[in-house]
Amino acid sequence: MSKKRLYEIAKELGKESKEVVARAKELGLDVKSHSSSVEEAVAAKIAASFKPAAAPKVEAKPAAPKVSAEKKAEKSEPAKPAVAKEEAKPAEPVAPKTEKVAAKPQSRNFKAEREARAKEQAERRKQNKGNNRDQQQNGNRQKNDGRNGGKQGQSNRDNRRFNDQAKKEQGQQKRRNERRQQEDKRSNQVAPRIDFKARAAALKAEQNAEYARSSEERFKQYQAAKEALAQANKRKEPEEIFEEAAKLAEQAQQVQAVVEVVPEKKEPAVDTRRKKQARPDKNRDDYDHEEDGPRKQQKNRSSQNQVRNQKNSNWNNNKKNKKGNNKNNRNQTPKPVTERKFHELPTEFEYTDGMTVAEIAKRIKREPAEIVKKLFMMGVMATQNQSLDGETIELLMVDYGIEAKQKVEVDNADIERFFVEDGYLNEDELVERPPVVTIMGHVDHGKTTLLDTLRNSRVATGEAGGITQHIGAYQIVENGKKITFLDTPGHAAFTSMRARGASVTDITILVVAADDGVMPQTIEAINHSKAANVPIIVAINKIDKPGANPERVIGELAEHGVMSTAWGGDSEFVEISAKFNQNIEELLETVLLVAEIQELKADPTVRAIGTVIEARLDKGKGAVATLLVQQGTLNVQDPIVVGNTFGRVRAMTNDLGRRVKVAGPSTPVSITGLNEAPMAGDHFAVYEDEKSARAAGEERAKRALMKQRQATQRVSLENLFDTLKAGELKSVNVIIKADVQGSVEALSASLQKIDVEGVKVTIVHSAVGAINESDVTLAEASNAFIVGFNVRPTPQARQQAEADDVEIRLHSIIYKVIEEMEEAMKGMLDPEFEEKVIGEAVIRETFKVSKVGTIGGFMVINGKVARDSKVRVIRDGVVIYDGELASLKHYKDDVKEVTNGREGGLMIDGYNDIKMDDVIEAYVMEEIKR
């Protein structure tokens, strides 16, 4: 026997596969899915179980759609003919429904009930589909009969129209049934609606009744009061009535007078359109609390608003009628003009120059027109926007009887005020500070050697020509107390630098050589110290040398006003030997003793102020300034104004080269972070924030520029002859470049002091840093030559100078520059030698050998390095050392020269501080042929 699958049975019956699977399981068959197969007998049994729910196929003759009554009957009851035909046809035997009920378990099974309800709904849907299918079959039979009967065209159109109409009516009936079901469900879920119109009408009627009742009560009260007053007046005599009437008239006149004098206060406009008259006897309607839930309360509030809107709906119309051509409104008297309130004049008036009339009027609470009138009476024509000077303002205040005081404005850009103001320091916060000691003296009298001995280092050995080139600041500790030392150059060219040192110092150590005595710079140092009112400690140095005569030194100093305490003076004398460290402890004890007598105090709690000791431009760091903190505490990231520039302290290093974050009073530090390099000797001050510091710095730079422009000499009748005479003079143009600002100032001042008849020196440009291309271009344009002091030209600048034939003079000792300039200007030049650079090398590695020194491994990058040539050590464009080679080797062999591109090793005579990336410049001196 053949088998059938369940989905094939479902397809034949027009059922879904899951329904057929469920029916098979109910019949006790072991099936798993719609793909399971069963015997034909079992398939017939499954099909028979669906027969009662399926719609029977009935052949019906096509009805003629001509009669309108039949169509109406079909529209009203479309399912009745099908039911009648089903009853007429004998049904096939099926299993009774009681079997299904008997198959259910006795206990209630909700899952089975849901499945049963789902099956019933599915059967009803199938039944409706069967009815539709029968109608379609009837329509198809009618079409066939029509074709066979010879009425093909008209019958087809009529049948099609009839079927479409039947489908449309069935769909409409179905939608109506669904809509009724949805409305029934919604009516069961939604609460009964409130009839707002009826509610509003009831509320309005209630309010009207309440208003009528209250109006009637007020009318009754008014009538009762009127009758009581009439009875009281009947009891009084006529004379008393007349007296009371007269009193009332007088009171009315007094009230009218007060109303005329006192202006009526204008109340702010308030919209009273929806406000009702208060009725204390009316009870609050609590109908909105009768129902629970926020939705009920919200609906009740909306009904209240509807009632209120209905009551006030005619408000705009009434308002328009009131604003119409009403004669009463036009005839109303205008309100009295309010008078200006009287303000008392101030007793004092603080003014500033340039105040306008309007500003003065606002301050003294008067009209500008009144002040303009007074000024006109005083003979001053002014408007309210015109500025007045201080004298005019004082005269105006005298006319008003006010005491005028000029307001003292604080200049934010003036940093000098911090050094002179008495209230800047807190007297309660003053603490003892280290003394600042300046070492002064003549050239080669041992100042730097003394300082070197104090610091236990050997920086004095490397000074070019034995002269300190710029100020150094250092700190030492003696007996647990700090002492700050400033070292100043001793040459005459550095007068301004010594003057700066004397202005910031507390004690001066005057170094005088015992074998040399008092020299010109010694006398100058004495004058600087006396001008600054600084005590002097005389250190008679070099007592170990033969021919030393300390007594002669004491006598010479006494002639210049420096008396020893042994001779009845106030200056301490100490005989020392800086070279052999003799009596150094005694000198330091004397310094601490003098400092203790002076009682040096400082306030570390205020913002830092102080002086610039030195400033320079560094290739990698930018502007670097050496500062001496005099008051307060300097911190990293402080906004600072230094001279005519400003910035923020980015990094701070002490005299040992170590990074620090805080610098107290009398502490020398080197800072970075400034926009430009300041001038040595400038004051600095820390501001509250960067904004105020920027404003102060820009204002100071602007003022300095204006001052420089105003200092430009103008031609006048007095200097006309001098100007014409100067035109006959020959001028020597010079461009000065140096390593530090102090050296630039010293060179400029020294060269301008050279007095040669018929020749003068003009400083075209002076700056800090290496010689660059712009300097060469400027020298070519101005026909000048360049003087470099402890700096070197860049390779590009050197090439450009050779191409443009610009002369560059490089020096490391200042008095040699001055002597050379004087000889050149006098035309007495001796045969001279010209420096010729023969090669350059770069240090790649260093090797320290005991008892020998430091060996530098180098590579020649340009030219050659010869054994008999002189060398310079250049670091970041600055000459560190200038000397001769002690050894030159290629591997282990001594060589006379190392050419370009080759490597070798060298040692420099007297210099061991060679570092990687140092540039070794080799040069020879060649005689210039004239």
Curated annotation (Swiss-Prot):
Query: Where does this protein have compositionally biased stretches of type Basic and acidic residues?
Result: 68-90, 110-125, 157-172, 262-295, 337-346
Biased composition regions of type Low complexity, renumbered to the chain: 50-67, 129-141, 309-318
Q: Which residues of the sequence carry a binding annotation for GTP?
A: 441-448, 487-491, 541-544
According to the UniProt record, one GO cellular component term is:
cytosol
Q: Which domain of life is it from?
A: Bacteria
Question: According to the UniProt record, where is the region G3?
Answer: 487-490
Q: What ranges does the record give for the region G1, renumbered to this chain?
A: 441-448
Q: Name one GO molecular function term.
A: GTPase activity
The question of whether Mitochondrion is a record keyword is answered with no
Region annotation G2: residue ranges? 466-470
Does the keyword Manganese belong to this entry?
no
Where is it localised? Cytoplasm
PANTHER family membership: TR-TYPE G DOMAIN-CONTAINING PROTEIN (PTHR43381:SF5), TRANSLATION INITIATION FACTOR IF-2-RELATED (PTHR43381)
Record's protein name:
Translation initiation factor IF-2
Q: Species name for this entry?
A: Streptococcus pneumoniae serotype 19F (strain G54)
